[in-house]
């Protein structure tokens, strides 16, 4: 499935708008991961434990969004965006969202 952050796809025509679509993932590093990450904050720099967790969560959110768009009968997603928030102090929510559409075949 084609997923793009743009409104239009060059050379393709949107035939039908299916509607909004999203994928949600909530992750927690766990006590051990949080402890290691908190030690890294003392010295500064990138907290790789959280970077890799968020990167993986984004990939999974996109995968879930694609599954939902496919169930709606779409073959593309336009205007894809990410949103994220913290739930409590130990969990992160990542949402991938966009507009599910049917585009013409090349």
Where would I find each of the regions flagged by the language model?
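Gly/Ser/Thr-rich beta-alpha loop segments that engage phosphate groups in nucleotides
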Residues: 46-47, 86, 100
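Short, well-ordered alpha-helical segments
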Residues: 21, 26, 34-81
């Amino acid at each position: 499935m084609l997923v793009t952050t743009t409104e239009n796809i060059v050379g393709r025509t949107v035939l039908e708008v299916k509607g909004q679509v999203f994928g949600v993932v909530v992750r927690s590093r766990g006590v051990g991961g949080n402890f290691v990450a908190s030690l890294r904050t003392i010295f500064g720099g990138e907290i790789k434990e959280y970077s890799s967790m968020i990167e993986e969560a984004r990939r999974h959110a996109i995968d879930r969004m694609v599954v939902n768009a496919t169930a709606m009968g779409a073959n593309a997603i336009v205007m894809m965006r990410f949103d994220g928030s913290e739930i409590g102090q130990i969990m992160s929510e990542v949402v991938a969202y966009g507009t599910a559409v049917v585009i013409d075949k090349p």
